[in-house]
């Protein structure tokens, strides 16, 4: 998700094809105001990092790694401030990416109570962190290893079916030391 937790999916700045856009459309289409209220409540105690002056969507933005839990039925989704904008374009930044993922892991370590955690390949696609899917996976696994945070139920990285053939999963399954 972006650092202003936008809920308007109109392809500027939130694309329908992004994980962010797909989440909003699948679980809150037509109920974006409800999601806005949940997000606002989740951000009540978070200090605003700044204000956008030239971006469509919400003007306030929050620190990288800010997490807002959103309960949908029996599932809890953890919305993550991962991307920052320059105008209406995502500004790729590895430092923000690393900070956000490490902060997410620390949050999940406290919040998940031993439940397994499923995360998408963060930074793929529209976040423009890395164009090569193999490198994105290697980066994410590297952060998981460096963090030393142990999620009791395990962390499962979910890859979109379109990534078949773009990521050599066997390379990582064989080398358990990466995790």
Spans of model-derived segments:
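Macrodomain-like recognition of ADP-ribose-binding/processing modules
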Residues: 1-179
